[in-house]
Design a protein with these regions (language model features):
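Alpha-helical transmembrane segments
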Residues: 2-16, 58-61, 131-135
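Short, hydrophobic transmembrane alpha-helix segments
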Residues: 17-27, 45-49
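Loop-to-helix transition at the N-terminal end of transmembrane alpha-helices
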Residues: 25-43, 54-59
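Membrane-interface transmembrane-helix boundary segments in multi-pass integral membrane proteins
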Residues: 26, 90-95, 159-186
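Hydrophobic cores of alpha-helical transmembrane segments in multi-pass inner/ER membrane proteins
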Residues: 33-44, 98-113, 175-192
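Membrane-interface helix-boundary motifs at transmembrane edges
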Residues: 44-56, 117-127
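Hydrophobic alpha-helical membrane-insertion segments
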Residues: 57-66, 129-146
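Juxtamembrane non-transmembrane "cap" segments at the membrane-aqueous interface
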Residues: 138-160
Length: 194
């Protein structure tokens, strides 16, 4: 219950910080909201007793979790120099951005942990369970960034989405995919193992 309260408080403070200080990072609010939804799906899967709702929440988590990886690309669009950060307005923008990064990474990991715990998977099989999720999210994120393909295309136009997958597979960067996977795996190993 503590995680539920603290994570929602963390989300509210992060969203208000980004909104109030007008942090100008591409798609930061969208990534932040996708992380909130991913975390909510994790909580629903964990606290629900109905297997159908748990399964729907798991599918929702698999939809929103790859969007959280966009925070790693937002680092590219930083506009602060070292001397500019220490000006009062820039410092608060930078701190709001750091708060958003911390929330997005921690909510992504916590949502995966909640998903694993929702299905009562023993500790020795947890890593084997999250590896396919991490591979899927890295693949989906790289596939989306290699072309004009978005995950929302599944809902809007399914046939065009699968044709777009074939087109984007030629441009897929497997080095980026493996790096994103390793970053997620290392963060899981460092932060989530008890």
């Amino acid at each position: 219950m503590k995680k539920l309260i603290w994570s929602h408080l963390f989300a509210i403070v992060s969203i208000l910080g980004i909104w109030y200080y007008h942090v100008k990072i591409d798609h930061l609010m969208v990534i932040l909201l996708a992380s909130v939804l991913s975390l909510e799906m994790g909580f629903i899967a964990y606290y629900s007793r109905n297997i159908f709702i748990r399964l729907l929440a798991s599918l929702g988590l698999l939809f929103f979790y790859p969007q959280s990886l966009g925070i790693f690309l937002s680092l590219v669009s930083l506009e602060w120099s070292t001397k500019d950060i220490w000006q009062s307005n820039h410092f608060m923008q930078y701190m709001a951005y750091l708060l958003a990064i911390l929330f997005i990474i921690s909510s992504a990991l916590l949502s995966l942990k909640l998903l694993v715990n929702a299905y009562d998977i023993s500790k020795r099989y947890q890593l084997a369970t999250v590896i396919p999720v991490m591979l899927f999210s890295s693949f989906a994120f790289c596939l989306e960034k290699s072309g004009s393909l978005g995950l929302e295309g599944i809902i809007l136009n399914t046939s065009a989405f699968f044709n777009g997958i074939q087109t984007n597979m030629a441009n897929l960067d497997f080095k980026a995919l493996s790096c994103l996977f390793l970053v997620q795996l290392l963060l899981w190993g460092i932060l989530m193992e008890d």
